[in-house]
Amino acid sequence: MTLLQRLQAMSATTTRTILEGSISSFGGGTNEPLASKIPVLEESASHARYLKFIADGLIDEGLGSAVGSGSSIAVSVEDVVAGQAQDIQASEGSTDDADGSSHLALVFVKCFIIGFIILAAILGNMLVIVSVMRHRKLRIITNYFVVSLAVADMLVALCAMTFNASVMISGKWMFGSVMCDMWNSFDVYFSTASIMHLCCISVDRYYAIVQPLDYPLIMTQRRVFIMLLMVWLSPALLSFLPICSGWYTTTENYKYLKSNPHICEFKVNKAYAIVSSSMSFWIPGIVMLSMYYRIYQEADRQERLVYRSKVAALLLEKHLQISQIPKPRPSIQVEQSTISTMRRERKAARTLGIIMSAFLICWLPFFLWYIVSSLCDSCITPRLLVGILFWIGYFNSALNPIIYAYFNRDFRAAFKKTLKSLFPYAFYFCRRGRGRDDDRDLEFGGPSRRGTNGAQRTGSGSAEMANCVNSTASSEIHMSVMRARQYAVNVTPTTDAQMQQLHPLYTN
């Protein structure tokens, strides 16, 4: 029988006895005067209070020890309530400890992920800048955009990610309303500049692959400088001017933010959302997709053209063998150079495609949420989801140098040389058979020659170092010969008319 049932039965028995004019105590059955019934009435009231506390959930029904079978309640209501309060406080303390440990673990995970993204963006883009400055082969027109992109991505990490990291970790804004406007301006400015740089790189690659003969005339240093100037100036029209003047949001929200400096929210009006998202993402994204599609079409066409040239070269070789004409076959040698050139162009197109894919994966979710939340007033998004979307977009600034290092051999070799100069002890041991392909891809203008002269002067160097120096020198000589072949005039017949004139048996 539970405590609630026992109390109900005892209360009913006591009330009925009082109404009959006599009450029997719980220990015996003697009749007593009405004045002596006052303690019993108090005990009955105590029972009623127990019932009310149990009904309200303040006292657990399982407290069977509070009431013995056939015995009076010896514990007062106040004592039971006090004990129950102590139990509640103890349970709340254990819950607070569990919540505190889980919150600490969540903060640690946030710090680790955010710190990794910020460090990768800063160090990776700085490595790109230093590598292009140190190595002459990387100083080409395309890499002007790459270096400028690295500067924009590094500034995204320094000026935008750091403030967002403080909000994500602390959960509040601690820098005032003026710095709130500056942070939002820096965020929009450098993120838009990074996206526009990717758009310019896609246009540059389009002319380099689709119109290679006109490329030196189109992408001159003057035009590249003008493009970079526009890329760095145009985002200011979307960031500093409307944000600092308050045009980007509603009047009520602007006054609310100014009166509450501990709050920093980027809540925009519909007009600014449409214009800013179009200029920052949708228009550059459409341009990049169209450029890459044209590059893919051209790469596929040239690949078929190279296949036809290879077939024509094999037919010519077979005809010369049948006719026993001991003539040189320059077309076959030049055809190999053409294949090598096409292979490099396909790799460049593939790298561009990977950069574009990373760009769309990182920024598309954010801008979809951005435009939907701005146009839908009743839509509410959790703060955690908004923060995740922001940092997925930021991660694109850390991905670009990783893509260059992994998919571009020139940058991979330059990164290796730069890191070797910065951390010489990490690359102390010379590994045989490794790194030669990377060394052949770059010409650094003399360090290996200086190493060769030094080895000749000493004459008593170790065999390992001598082998490394000799292999480096021989690889440079071999690469010079290969470059001389690659710069030969392309005389491979490409059209059907030229094939027909060269060999009457050729058919398409």
UniProtKB/Swiss-Prot annotation:
Q: Which Pfam families match?
A: 7tm_1
Which InterPro entries is this protein grouped with?
A: ADR_fam, GPCR_Rhodpsn, GPCR_Rhodpsn_7TM
Cite the record's Polar residues compositional bias ranges: 450-461
Cell compartment(s), UniProt:
Cell membrane
Domain of life, source organism? Eukaryota
UniProt note on tissues of expression: In the adult, expressed in the superior protocerebrum and the optic lobe medulla of the central nervous system, nurse cells of egg chambers in the ovary at oogenic stages 1-10, and spermatogonia and spermatocytes in the testis. Expressed in embryonic and larval ventral nerve cord and brain lobe, and the larval imaginal disk and larval salivary gland. Also expressed in larval synaptic boutons and retinal cells in the optic disk.
Glycans attached where? 164
State any single GO MF term: octopamine receptor activity
Gene Ontology cellular-component terms listed: membrane; plasma membrane
Please give the biological process terms from Gene Ontology that the record holds.
Answer: adenylate cyclase-activating adrenergic receptor signaling pathway; adenylate cyclase-activating G protein-coupled receptor signaling pathway; adenylate cyclase-modulating G protein-coupled receptor signaling pathway; negative regulation of synaptic assembly at neuromuscular junction; positive regulation of MAPK cascade
Chief location bin = membrane
Q: Where is this region: Disordered?
A: 440-464
Q: What happens when the gene is disrupted?
A: Fails to respond to starvation by increasing locomotor activity. Decreased basal levels of locomotion. Overgrowth of octopaminergic and glutamatergic (type I and type II) neuromuscular junctions. Increase in the number of terminal type I and type II boutons and in the motile filopodia-like extensions (synaptopods) which form during the expansion of type II terminals in developing larvae.
UniProt keywords (A-Z) are: Cell membrane, G-protein coupled receptor, Glycoprotein, Membrane, Receptor, Transducer, Transmembrane, Transmembrane helix
Task: Explain the purpose of this protein.
Answer: Autoreceptor for octopamine, which is a neurotransmitter, neurohormone, and neuromodulator in invertebrates. Negatively regulates synaptic growth by activating the inhibitory G protein Galphao and limiting cAMP production. Antagonizes the action of Octbeta2R which stimulates synaptic growth.
- The protein depicted here goes by the name Octopamine receptor beta-1R
Species per Swiss-Prot/TrEMBL record:
Drosophila melanogaster (Fruit fly)
- The encoding gene is Octbeta1R
